[in-house]
Amino acid sequence: MTISPIPGLLFVYDQPPHSIYVLPFVISAAALCYFIGLIVFNLWFHPLARFPGPLLARSTLLWRMRMTLKGRIHRSIEAGHQKYGPVLRVAPNELSFASVSSWKSIYGHRPGGMIPTKSEFYDMYGSGFNSLCIGSERDPEKHRQMKSFLSAAFSTKALLEQEPLVSQTVDAFITRLGNDGGSETKGLDMTKWTEMVAFDILGEMAFGQSFECIIRGEPHYWQEMILKHLYFITVADNLRRLPFALTLARFLAPVLTAVRNKHSQFTRDKVAERMTNKNLRKDFMSNLISKVESGEVDREEMTAHASTLIIAGGETVATFLAATVYYLLKTPEVYKAMREEIRNRFPTYESINATSAQQLPYLQAVINEGLRIYPPGSQGFPRLSPGLAIDGEWIPEGTEIYTSAWTVTHNPQMFKDPMKFDPNRWLNEKSTDIKESSQPFSLGPRGCLGRNFALMELNLILSKLCWKYDMELMDQSLDWEGQSKVHVMWDKPALTVRFHSVDGSTLKA
């Protein structure tokens, strides 16, 4: 308290205590000490301190955040493995592996042993729903139960019943390519059109009706919403690792929640429409609907399953198709050999079917090579260690682990000339390539449920596409992988292709 020094005036005023000025410095000093202490702990006292990696990766989350947000994390991890070896510390509590054996250790069946569970990353698949689903369920036993009743939709019998529905959409796709991207045009962006056909197929299979992207000639807004917000999912995946994640989550909630709620409500609406459609068509939902009606499965769970099928199933197929078309057109001798095999096997377009296409050895080699050189899940499938040994190293419980799919499939010790698109490596019995290094669908009890359905799509589309047209890449300077980014899934460049009909016929859409 101080008395006024001005004559004639006498009043008392409060002077702020000295501590108010000091407080910001105290807080700053405490924060600095905390972060210095955290860095010291991560570098020398953390359970993973013995594992090599870039200094910034071992000490903080900054290296991981920078590389994932740039979209080149797959290349950064590959470079890290080249420098530091088969085990790389990507973040203070995260390890990447680059060995064949790590596939089985992390993802394979472990009789009588603890199974590495999915990490928190997979929570995004159930976000916005009041139920877990095949994508977000992290409990191994509950996941097994979900997979068992969903698997009926992906059996050999079910695939044969579903093929006419898929073929109908594929035929419309093939027709539009020729009509809108024919010899007298500037071509079409196959990155966009493969996403559209994959989305239309999943609309038929999950909701009983196409999204009509192919008919309208433009992507559905739901598809665009999913793709445009993959970057925000990458941001959220990084933020969940921070000690103040909940505060940041509340700050970002208006942005992320609006998108999430729009997505989940649209899924609910589409499932409601499918539930009222009592036709006898066989699709992904037909078996689930009977279980919902009998009370075995909750309707919200069914909705969350449908959402996962759309997100995971559509983009992975589209990614493979666009990438494989690019590599085919950049490797003329491969493209020529594949066209000849397909056209020699099928006398007419109408005679093409998935079962026969899957018997074509060179086509299967092309598919395997496409999945190797540009794996849809290139960043890896993150798991949490229960406390186990991988490649002779004990990995403490709670460590986030994965096999770097990109690194193992682009390692010269695994595949000769790994950047070369060479389907013959899958046909040559004398090849020294370690083919089990490529696991695009993962493996073990949580391997991709839709693997066989995806292969049916790929065989049908590639066979019909290469039978009907000679394709022309309009931009020969395009560096497909170099211009791609990874934000959970691939963010791909435009791929402009022109289609020259080989027989001049017009298909009925």
From Swiss-Prot:
This protein's superkingdom? Eukaryota
Q: What is its main location?
A: membrane
PROSITE patterns attached to this UniProt entry = CYTOCHROME_P450 (PS00086)
The Gene Ontology biological process annotation of the record reads: mycotoxin biosynthetic process
Q: In which pathway does it act?
A: Sesquiterpene biosynthesis
Keywords tagged on the record: Glycoprotein, Heme, Iron, Membrane, Metal-binding, Monooxygenase, Oxidoreductase, Transmembrane, Transmembrane helix
Naming one, the record's GO cellular component terms include: membrane
Q: Where in the cell is it found?
A: Membrane
Q: List all membrane-crossing ranges.
A: 20-40, 309-329
Family matches, as CDD domains: CYP60B-like
Record's bilayer topology term: Multi-pass membrane protein
Residues binding heme: 448
The cofactors required by this protein are: heme
**Which Gene3D superfamilies does the record cross-reference, listed alphabetically?**
Cytochrome P450
Give the record's family classification: Belongs to the cytochrome P450 family.
Q: What does this protein do?
A: Cytochrome P450 monooxygenase; part of the gene cluster that mediates the biosynthesis of PR-toxin, a bicyclic sesquiterpene belonging to the eremophilane class and acting as a mycotoxin. The first step of the pathway is catalyzed by the aristolochene synthase which performs the cyclization of trans,trans-farnesyl diphosphate (FPP) to the bicyclic sesquiterpene aristolochene. Following the formation of aristolochene, the non-oxygenated aristolochene is converted to the trioxygenated intermediate eremofortin B, via 7-epi-neopetasone.
In Swiss-Prot or TrEMBL terms, this protein is called Cytochrome P450 monooxygenase ORF9
Q: Which organism is it from?
A: Penicillium roqueforti (strain FM164)
High-level lineage: Eukaryota, Fungi, Dikarya, Ascomycota, Pezizomycotina
Name of the gene: ORF9
